[in-house]
């Protein structure tokens, strides 16, 4: 309880993205239908934590989000297929939701996903 409690009270969110995700999950999981949550959790695990995981929440800026967006837009499946615009928007919305939660409830100063657009 000690470390997590201290991390939850940190005003600059000086923890990594992957360390923040369990806090987000604990706060949000029960607010969605199970099928919706499973989709969100898959995106968080495979698209967000895999890219931003080791970065501190307070150090991620809009340029980092734009670099991630460019990587997602450039992704191709083994068959050469790109992610659809709707899926790319879904990915961005989930990233923005994580950062919005950090801003509203954990003292992060700004949402870099909202700034990146």
Locate each region found by the language model:
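N-terminal helical hairpins
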Residues: 1-14, 30-31
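N-terminal core-binding DNA-recognition domain of tyrosine site-specific recombinases/integrases
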Residues: 13, 25-112
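Short, intrinsically disordered, charge-balanced linker/junction segments flanking boundaries
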Residues: 113-117
């Amino acid at each position: 309880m000690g470390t997590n409690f201290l991390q939850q009270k940190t005003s600059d969110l000086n923890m990594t993205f992957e360390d923040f995700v369990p806090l987000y999950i604990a706060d949000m999981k029960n607010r969605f239908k199970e099928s919706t949550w499973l989709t969100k959790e898959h995106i968080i695990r495979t698209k967000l934590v895999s890219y931003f995981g080791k970065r501190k929440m307070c150090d991620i800026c809009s340029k980092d989000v734009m670099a991630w967006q460019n990587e997602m837009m450039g992704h191709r499946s083994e068959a050469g297929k790109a992610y659809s615009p709707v899926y790319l928007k879904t990915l961005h919305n989930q990233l923005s939701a994580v950062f919005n939660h950090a801003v509203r409830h954990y003292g992060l100063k700004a949402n870099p996903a909202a700034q990146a657009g």
